[in-house]
Amino acid sequence: MSFDGMDFETRAVHVGSAPDPATGAVIAPIYQTSTFAQEEVGSHKGYEYARTGNPTRTNLETCLASLEGVAPGRPGGGLCFASGMAATTTVLQTLAPGDHMVLSADVYGGTYRVAARLFEGWGLRLSVVDMTSLDRLKQAIRAETRLVWVETPTNPLLGVVDIAAAAEAAHAAGAVCAVDNTFATPFLQRPLGLGADLVVHSSTKYLGGHSDVVGGALVTPLPELYERARFLQNAAGAVPGPMDCWLTLRGVKTLALRMRAHCHNAMRVAAFLADRPEVAEVRYPGLPSDPGHELAARQMAAFGGMVAFRPAGGVEAAKRLVAATEVFTLAESLGGVESLIELPGEMTHASVAGTDAEVPADLVRLSVGVEHPDDLVADLAQALERA
């Protein structure tokens, strides 16, 4: 049965999850195998070696592609990797020495690290700009620009980038526009429908949703780009195991339900923080006062589960606060059902200290989970009082 054209929630449950034809099992099995029997030399049933392909991985790739707008049987598709950084690295490997890349100044620290500390050494030319300013983005694009890398909302400052405008600027220079859609997920934002050429995810985060699996993915409708990335996936071999794929596929089934709860709770938390005298600044696109609010309202279905803020007492107050929460767990990562709190400057973004992508030392980042919002607000209230 084709689920093309059905709503997001239906496709999240059913695409890539057909009942097993051999047994009738409603949930597709985990194909925990490294190799596949061949009928004769050069003749097999679609799989030969698990680095090249595995049915469980295919199921997940098909599902994620559908959710991002590339239906089964259409040009392009989805590819899964052992981590979000493996997916990012694969995209950068499509570039050649001398090519130029434009990267957001507010970006995941690992993305900056691999671009600036690894690929620049191999001949990549890199410009880091504030992409919330379209003028600055356009000024950074050169004749040799081949990739414009967008994060929106950005990590960790929750800036909002105009995807359609960024894609148009990239295409005018003959460049590819890639969007890291990890924070928003395809439930809230569909970059391909706004003109982007490629979407990247850390599926560790909201797609998996339970903090129990590490993975990455990319989706593109462009056949040539898909085939190049597929070659690199197989050649470099940074692929997820079947158990990781199965766990992620299980998580995706409840993505819509979880994202609604994340968004609702994040709005409650952000509004609470905005009214507290101990808080100097709150960044959340859902607040009408946020500089990215109007744009986010146009290109997102809701505003996501991430909140950032700066305590009025500076970095020492921030350190005391993150150590004082009881419901929020002090930990890196994001997107799980449980609420997390961290200091990006010393944790997830420590690698960008002293660079153009450095984040404020007193910034606190929240991954707001699906607990009861009253408990989350109460926890932050007591932590602010103790800090």
Question: Where are each of the predicted segments found?
Answer:
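Conserved small-domain helix->loop->beta segment predominantly found in fold-type I
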Residues: 267-326, 330-335, 349-358
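A common structural junction motif
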Residues: 236-237, 324-333, 383-387
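Conserved PLP-enzyme active-site core in the AAT-like
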Residues: 2, 14, 67, 73-278
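Short, well-ordered beta-strand elements within core beta-sheets of diverse protein domains
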Residues: 248-257, 304-312, 364-369
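N-terminal "arm"/small-domain region of PLP-dependent enzymes with the aminotransferase-like
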Residues: 1-54, 60-63
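PLP-dependent enzyme catalytic core of the Aspartate aminotransferase-like
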Residues: 72, 116, 125, 139, ...
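Glycine-rich beta-alpha junction loops
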Residues: 17-19, 32-37, 183, 205, ...
